[in-house]
Amino acid sequence: MISLKNFGLLFWKRFSENKLNQVAGALTYSTMLAIVPLVMVIFSIFSAFPVFNEVTGELKEMIFTNFAPSASDMVGEYIDQFVSNSKKMSAVGIVSLIAVALMLINNIDRTLNSIWHNSQSRSPLSSFAIYWMILTLGPLIIGVSIGISSYIKIMFEQSEHLSLGLKLLSFVPFLFTWFIFTLIYTVVPNKKVKIKHSAYGAFLAAIFFTLGKQAFTWYVVTFPSYQLIYGAMATLPIMLLWIQISWLVVLVGAQLASTLDEIGEQIEQ
């Protein structure tokens, strides 16, 4: 049985070897390039299903709040404008935007597989099928989840005897974040990952992500140095900083799950 100290040393060694700080920066750059194509694809899929019209507003709020907690309104206006402009694009332009979105998913795939030290790659056809499924089915799954949460919330609000349930409902965003991270850490690596290890890494990432979002919002509001220095352009560095923090949290959770897997394999041997 490995001690907590040795586990911490191994975790930090793998974190340094994988250069996760630099990787988070690279993913931030990729995300900034792909955010408009991703949002365009997501809301195009939603518009094709009238049943999701009622939850589109909630989905927008969730996306904008997670990408820029302190500047969600301004970011929302910009992205609405970008998506509106994308509707005027030609077929070639739309294909190009989708390709950029798929490239981001490919970068995430390669990054997580490198954390698990997995050199075995999928075939191009298999990779494309998985990326396309994520790009198309992902928004539908999120939409269904938001719709169910909204329905349950309305049901609790209409009942005077379910106030406890309404309070418990406040944990749904955290549980949903935990579930998404667990799914990513389990499915994306091209090797068998124990779900309990994925869940441990995802739990840590979900805690850091939730607390980090609150702390980041508090810092930006309390110490508005970015607004003083950058003025009207303050949204851009704020958004860049938050996206990098978010990716670092995702990678830390992945590294924890990978380290647990590595230790488990050593014990089994």
UniProtKB/Swiss-Prot annotation:
Question: What Gene Ontology terms describe where this protein resides (cellular component)?
Answer: plasma membrane
Look up the domain of life of the source: Bacteria
- Transmembrane spans: 32-52, 89-109, 128-148, 168-188, 203-223, 232-252
Keywords attached to this Swiss-Prot or TrEMBL record, sorted alphabetically, are:
Cell inner membrane, Cell membrane, Membrane, Transmembrane, Transmembrane helix
In terms of InterPro entries, this protein maps to:
UPF0761_bac (IPR023679), Virul_fac_BrkB (IPR017039)
- Glycosyltransferase keyword on record: no
Q: Where in the cell is it found?
A: Cell inner membrane
Signal peptide (from-to):
none
Q: What is its main location?
A: membrane
Specify the protein name: UPF0761 membrane protein NTHI0384
Q: What is the lineage of its organism?
A: Bacteria, Pseudomonadati, Pseudomonadota, Gammaproteobacteria, Pasteurellales
